[in-house]
Design a protein with these regions (language model features):
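Flexible coil segments in periplasmic/lumen-exposed cytochrome c-class electron-transfer proteins
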Residues: 25, 35-36, 44-73, 104-164
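Short, cysteine/histidine-rich loop/knuckle motifs that typically chelate Zn2+
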Residues: 41
Length: 164
């Protein structure tokens, strides 16, 4: 009887470790995906500058880009900050943003966001990427905009030339 109690206790104690290892593997997979999907190429405070800021990854860009005829867009904060990032978004809302281009309020993301390239991501990879984004240290960083074509822009930006 004593052996059964010891085995049962050991099994119960190992469950949190197994869950922790699975969660770590999920976040690690998500970090890999964020890297190959080049999320930091835009959603970084040093994006579009000679010196990217790697201390606050994916906390949004302070340099925007203009899409002629559409406006100026600043890549937003993807950290789990509740005020300026994705902290109030559900897993489903985050996944809909990068697979369907939909914001929680129903508006579409800027066309420069390559969500169509990510629309066929597997459900497991979508959850991994979301787990990684949620694992980041929250950074309060309110990026400017977006700005319509006739609005005054309050930050530096690049102009994109669309193919003809």
């Amino acid at each position: 009887m004593r052996n059964i109690a010891i085995i049962a206790g050991a099994a119960l104690l190992s469950m949190p470790i197994a869950n922790s290892v699975q969660a770590d593997a999920l976040v690690e997979r998500g970090a890999y995906l964020a890297n190959i999907m080049d999320c930091g190429g835009c959603h970084n405070t040093g994006a579009f500058t000679p010196e990217p800021n790697l201390k606050t990854p994916l906390s949004g860009s302070l340099v925007g880009f203009e899409i002629p005829g559409m406006g100026v867009f600043f890549p937003p904060n993807l950290t789990p900050d509740k005020k300026t990032g994705l902290g109030e978004w559900t897993e489903e809302q985050i996944i809909a943003a990068f697979t369907k281009g939909e914001r929680p309020d129903g508006r579409m993301l800027a066309p420069a966001m390559p969500w169509m390239s990510y629309s066929h991501i597997t459900p497991d990879d979508a959850k991994a990427l979301t787990a990684y984004l949620r694992s980041l240290t929250p950074v309060e960083n309110q990026v400017p905009g977006p700005f319509g074509p006739s609005e005054k822009v309050t930050g530096p930006y690049l102009t994109m030339k669309m193919p003809e």
